[in-house]
Amino acid sequence: MNIRRFKESDAVAVSAVVIKTLRISNVKDYPAELMEEVVKSQQPQNILERASWTHFYVVEDGDKIIGCGSIGPFWGKEDESGLFTIFVLPKYQGKGVGRLIMETLEKDEYFLRAKRIEIPSSITGCQFYRKFGYDYKNGVAELDEERLYRLEKFREI
């Protein structure tokens, strides 16, 4: 397994990883119709746009992309960052790929400069992120209007 920065040529493969994961893993926690709406926003052009303002990483097994994750400024703030688009192909879940992504994101300069890091978390990923010390924003353990949990972690910098 190897983790590296995203290249534009990865967009189609990353989109496929995200979409497959949404349709197999996330659909267990959300209606299929909602997942198909989310799929529309995870096309290669959407991935390229997100990669333009984040530090986007991919995990490879050989030459196959099996996971991804990104970190970027939270609404343009210098001292707050957000984690986005963290997905691992279902076949590779539970094998340390997600941990590798999180460890990499938490070494990135956007993480290291931030006092607060926020994750818009799916129901599917919530407990995974909580293992890394992220907790419910303002203590609110309820889904927001996007049907996501807002998780956050504070750091001393």
How should each PLM-predicted stretch be described?
Residues 88, 94-107, 131:
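Conserved acetyl-CoA-binding loop-helix of GNAT-fold acetyltransferases
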Residues 128-129, 134:
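Conserved hydrophobic/aromatic "anchor" residues
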Residues 1-12, 154-157:
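Conserved N-terminal entry element of GNAT/NAT acetyltransferase domains
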Residues 118-120, 135-151:
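Conserved catalytic-core motifs of GNAT/GCN5-like acyltransferases
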Residues 60-62, 153-156:
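Active-site beta-strand termini and strand-to-loop segments that position acidic
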Residues 102, 109-122:
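Conserved GNAT acetyl-CoA-binding A-motif
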Residues 21, 108, 128:
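Short alpha-helical functional segments enriched in proximate histidine and acidic residues
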Residues 5-9, 16-90, 102-104, 142:
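Acetyl-CoA-dependent GNAT
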